[in-house]
Amino acid sequence: MTNNITPIHEYKKYWAECFGTAPFLPTSRKEMDALGWDSCDIIIVTGDAYVDHPSFGMAIIGRLLEAQGFRVGIIAQPEWQNKNAFMQLGKPNLFFGITAGNMDSMINRYTADKKLRHDDAYTPNNEGGKRPDRATLVYSQRCREAYKEVPIVLGGIEASLRRVAHYDYWSDKVRRSVLFDAKADILLFGNAERALVEVAHRIANGEDISTMTNIRGTAVNLPAAPEGYTVIDSSRIEKPRKEAFVPKNPYEVETQCETKKDEPVAQPITIRPSRHDAATTAVRLPSFEKLRNDRILYAHASRVLHLETNPYSGRALLQSHGDRELWVNQAPIPLTTEEMDFVFGLPYARVPHPMYGKAKIPAYDMIKTSVNIMRGCFGGCSFCSITEHEGRIIQNRSKESIINEIEEIRDKVPGFTGTISDLGGPTANMYRLGCKDPKAEANCRRPSCVFPGICNKLNTDHKHTIDLYREARKVEGVKKVMVASGVRYDLAIESPEYVKELVTHHVGGYLKIAPEHTEKGPLDLMMKPGMGTYDRFKEMFEKYSAEAGKKQYLIPYFISAHPGTEDEDMLNLALWLKKNNFECDQVQNFYPSPMCNATSMYYSETNPLKRVKYKQREDIPVAKGERQRRLHKALLRYHDPANWPLIREALINMGKKHLIGDKPTCLVPAEDIDAQTPAQRRKSGRHGANRFATKHTKNQPGFGGHLNKRAEGGSKDGKPSGNRNGSGKVQGGQRPASNGQRPSGNGANRPAGSKPQGQGRPQGQGKPAGQRKPKRR
């Protein structure tokens, strides 16, 4: 299937290879002069600080192009108000490569509630405001102002997930493909190493970029559809059937009588294009102009797009934008293990550029001792965009390459303590897993290999991962190898030996997993397994932890306000959390990021996982209003007194008043009118909130730390001031003991570095691939 693909490490090198390898890719004319360069062949503009590490997109792309012989410069987080910063390295000989960074710039700058963030993990000292909104567009405009004739190549996750007309959460409307708004020459989607190397060499050979219309993994702006393709029209949901056709004049149709019977007329044979002719077939999506006014049609377009993501059988896409055509080529062929080893084996310095001095870059600090062992994810979660960006087929590194990187970390990273912080990827336990049938894999259009059940053609044997873990632990100078990436527990329970290996050697007290919800309705729309699977994994986890003599805890992640979630679903989740003694410290509402299936659900209020029709469709409830989204988030933090008024009001409206009170079965305590000030009784507190103080009995678990200060003799900072009078009151700051309560806070029987279950920081997740950890791009 890939015989005609040139491996990325076998291209003839560009003449500038004679300059050798730079210690860091230059960011100024002074650095260029030190390298003996008179100009750059390619300049990469990025919204992140420049860290020469394989978890950062600009470093991988820059080092890859350098390995092809090109002179590559970096303009990191430029001042975007004028063109001057974009001219600091001079005019590139070949093209500008533009990326917003490892994250979509809008997700980076705004919360799920559209509030401006004041920090940025990809910026020195965690400083916010160093990149513009829609950075890809702004950087493209400034590059065009600086050097009008230089080609512009878009890449990175922001461009990748906005390659077609898409719903934009921040403006609450459907926007054009970013390729049109940026006025760029070509867009590369996915990780894009293969497409980028081909584009660079073809431009270097003198080919005009406007002629590069058939490169896999690219999107281009054309005046008309390319010739030689059979176009299948999917721009409408329901087409009139041929038998429903009625001629304008009924007398034009000659009726037959019994005495006059014509011989059957030979009908022309029509040959339907086979899916195996994907190389010469394209699918027309609804136009941008139609999508921005028809939310049901948008759900249909999203469904069609997701069905065409298989790199072997997926077809090119065509979408009209006014009088122009957006042409999206087939998905890129996944990198082989040899190519993955080549990319991750490039000469990275593994530290931030020296120009940042001693400034801390939080994203780098998080991943400086982590190793990415694979790419891609076949989980297909609706709220996640990893599959749309990296693909469903897992791209693996060899064990030797991974061990070599661990040794590099040991030798190069300043202050290495002997701990590898993570050995994983988008999912911790998909290394060398995949379809056992190559023919089935080449033609499969399932959105997930594990939902609604694990495909019988999927290899779930974790032996390669187990062997890798054991080899990593043997590396000299390495004391501990952790697994911090999320574990897909429905896969893990298929291999008890893997769970035992993981729990015994690679969990540092807590293990992150993502059930995301407890109710079947939301879980089905998320394409996540039911809670029975979670319970089976929890049982195995606790069993092997006990056998290893360790007290370890699961940290579950949950999403609030996901499409398809009703108030009662969130209430049931909150009751489950309380029953299991979990208190979520960090919670996030669902974040509609471009191209996700769940984003299509959010906008269209329709299920795109099933066939979409105007009359016969599955409508789903969506929490869009600010108050309802606040309620869903508040229910995940049922233990926070600030959320109690909102939860009480909702429980009363839902007819669930019996869940308000001091009984162990209640979710929140009743309001204590006697403890309120007159202003609080008038509901005239700060920001119009009903600020309150509440007393609790010993029978209400989980609220001991929120006792009223004046009533209980607490100190000014709200902490207990010693022994308290009265039955069940806290002695010395400890929580009262009661059935079903979290373990006591004295830690007497707790191993170092661990907490009782429920005291971790589970957080609801809804961000695009590549955006939970900085290693994604």
Swiss-Prot record:
Ranges annotated as biased composition (Low complexity): 755-769
Cofactor annotation: [4Fe-4S] cluster
Pfam family, one: Radical_SAM_N
Basic residues bias: start-end ranges: 680-698
Radical SAM core domain boundaries: 363-642
Keywords annotated in UniProt: 4Fe-4S, Iron, Iron-sulfur, Metal-binding, S-adenosyl-L-methionine
Residues the record lists as binding [4Fe-4S] cluster: C377, C381, C384
Comment on bound cofactor: Binds 1 [4Fe-4S] cluster. The cluster is coordinated with 3 cysteines and an exchangeable S-adenosyl-L-methionine.
Compositionally biased intervals (Basic and acidic residues): 709-719
UniProt-recorded name of the protein: UPF0313 protein VP1980
